[in-house]
Amino acid sequence: METLKKYYTVLENRTGIWLENDEIAYLSDKSGIIQVWKMNIHEKKPVQLTYYNERIWRLEAAANHRDILFSTDLGGNEQEQIFLLKAGETEPVNLTDDGATRFNLGGTNAASDMVYFTCNRRSKPNFDICKMDIGTREITTVLENSDNMNMPSSVSPDGRFMLYNKLKGMSDNRMHIVDMYTGESRDIFPEGSFAQYGSPAWKSDSDGFYFTCDENDEFLYVGYYDVATGTVRHVYHTDHDVTKVALSCDDKYLAMVVSVDGFGQFRIMDLTKGSFISCPVPPNGFIYTYAGMHWSPAGHKLLFTFSSGSRPTGLWVLDLDADAVYALTDSELSADIRDRLADPEARSFTSFDGLRISYLLYKANDNPDNPTIIQVHGGPESQEFPMYDPLIQYLVGQGFNIAAPNIRGSIGYGKSFHHLDDVEKRLDSIQDIACLARHLLETGIVKPGRLGIMGASYGGYAALSAIAHYPELWSAAIDIVGMSNLETFLENTAPYRRSHREGEYGSLANHRDVLRKVSPIHVAHRITAPLMVIHGANDPRVPVSEAEQIVTNLESRGISVKYLCYGDEGHGIMKLANKLDCYPQVVTFLKAHLL
């Protein structure tokens, strides 16, 4: 499995932020786990700044562009703590130091002597708006909340306002603005209803901000909020999601990312003219929207994270002044696997009710005997993106095809599509997977007996459901941190997550019958395919009891189950040593049952 190791030791560099003097800080797994690094963009000599055994979750620059704020947890438990690394110092300071509380980092005030965040210190299911005096470590509660999970999204340049989202659901996260001096909070679109908001980009004078939302629309569009008047105006709309915006520091250029079947496209608007400009473009692939996108403090360099099937995740720069786009970081990709990497082809099929479903196909070659694996993304309010995945790339190199669908319930195809799997409609998305399987068989991409399925989180739930409801289609399945019983999942997930997850799956108070009906544990007697189950013991999202239930059920009936549980992991396998233990076993399992 030495070759597989080369795929997993390719560097992931992402989430870049600008510091002073053309320096950036960013996240990289060069040490084997995601840590904070920095480098000068001209010298390109990376320097490691943190040395923890746990991954870094969030990274922000202080308002002074010298100090760095970040968060990490313990063993994947997601009880994030906020750390400060001051310029010129080598030892970060744990500002919060309360392992019983989760702190969601917001940012700093203009003087960089106060840090803003939300936390559930007062009440574990709820997140209050708070600020801390960095000098004294005194925490002040600005606004108490009793409505579950409130996530900070941005702080105004003058430090007066913080924006935060109220997560009623992953796609129902109304944005609020809170005055950090007075505690006054208001919904930026009070007459609105069910919608998602994100990616705020403040003007330098703090008078307002650009953002994305799908209020009263099928797709995410760009709006502008005026703080003084409390009004919203439309800026840009298209028949695809605008997933990210970023405003240059001189307020001249507004960068937007438009997602078409998961492939990112830049649109740059010159706000002084109200029109788009031409600009160099990166290769065809995925522009990470959740990993940040930032303009340089001086000039017009846009720092972003990019990946494709054949290009591992790295930091790139779009330099408008130089009319150039280029990779900034090195993935250290081994020369002997560089030419093996495959980019996917965007395809589609028609599901049981006539709905068009898109999928990405990574094809090994034209050999009709190649096994094929359907990989289902998590979320479910997420999307399959054309990005580097070490397991996919290795399997393709070993002669496997990978089909990665965006079944109903995925984002990126409109709000109506997004909600076609809610609550009692859950199994319609599983029927989409069965239709894809039959499509692959009918088109000759795979032969009977050579089809498998795998997925993580919701994708793990989907894999379990597919092999239970359509057992005749599958010869192997892999469930990674997936739910086997939606009822017990909601009962045992972290208290602050329950409410916004109930918006997707149904509530314990009103939908227990539905939750039982759509849970694979209750139809597990139909499962015949060999199964591999992988989980982290500290998972706060999908408790390890979800894995234990399905493993115990199948083993009691003599069904082949291989179970891996990692004591120092949470919701996913993040540490290199564990990856190098886990994924060779995944490959061995798939080869044994599909080749």
Regions found by a protein language model. Name each.
Residues 1-14, 39-57, 75, 85-102, ...:
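Multi-bladed beta-propeller domains
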Residues 15-65:
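N-terminal cofactor/phosphate-binding cores enriched in small/glycine residues
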Residues 18-19, 61-62, 108, 155, ...:
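Residue-level recognition of a conserved intra-blade site in WD40 beta-propeller repeats
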Residues 20-31, 40, 49, 69-76, ...:
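Beta-strand C-termini and the immediately following turn/loop, strongest in propeller blades
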Residues 32-37, 77-83, 124-130, 171-176, ...:
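Structural motif
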Residues 294-295, 301-321, 484:
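Structured, non-catalytic alpha/beta "coupling" segments that mediate domain-domain communication
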Residues 331-449, 456-457, 490-499:
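Cap/lid segment of the alpha/beta-hydrolase catalytic domain
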Residues 407-595:
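Active-site-proximal cap/loop segments of hydrolase catalytic domains
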